[in-house]
Amino acid sequence: EDGILGGGELNNHIFCEILHKRGHVVRRVHSHELTRDIIEENKQEYCFIIANFLNIKPDVISAIRNLTRYVIYEHDHKYLKTRNPALYEDFQAPADQLVYHDFYASALAVLCQSSMHKDIVEKNLKLNNIHSLSGNLWSTDVLDFIEELSQGEKKPECSIMESNIDHKNTSGAVKYCILKNMEYDLIAPSDYKKFIKRLSQNESLVFFPKT
């Protein structure tokens, strides 16, 4: 995984906690720190769960594919150059836009977040190892916190997540609010609970992700 605390990373954290509570030994490695030596040392004892591989070096990806048992926990569409299937008719990208096909094909399983997510991945990669988890993972603590926030007073503004990541599409949300003459509040990512608390202080959220 990577060190950035976003939705995918929080989901990874809960997933690891569940595995740990069920008696499994979990070793976490940031994607950019994964090496061939780490793979070689652990390939017999561990099954690798790859949640983010964009910062893994190509030779290390080859080592994973050829030497180890691994599962891909897919949070978006990293098999596409654009990572955005919505750009293409019926969510099906041209063949020249596909990447990492062999990496997905060699996995024991590719775990997707929903049945729609699974269908889109399957449509593009044409593989039979793709599965839907039917949702994301949440801790009881976070769910209780969100329920508590839902009861608070709201300002008549729109929350917009401030991000320079292209597929978060902050500019699209701002343009929409300006077009509709809606007041908005740009909220920069921070500590997770502080961030969702800030989001919850407004009546609505405007978000047009590109993936």
Language model features with spans:
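Short amphipathic alpha-helix with an adjacent loop that forms part of the alpha/beta core around
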Residues: 36-44, 60-63, 198-199
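Active-site proximal beta-strand in glycosyltransferases
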Residues: 47-49, 65-94, 111
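Alpha-helix capping/helix-boundary segments
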Residues: 55, 78, 116-118
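Membrane-proximal helix-turn-helix segments that form the acceptor-binding/catalytic region
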Residues: 89-110, 119
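A short, active-site helix/loop in glycosyltransferases that binds the activated sugar's phosphate group
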Residues: 105-130, 169
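Conserved catalytic-core segment of nucleotide-activated headgroup transferases in glycan assembly
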Residues: 138-200
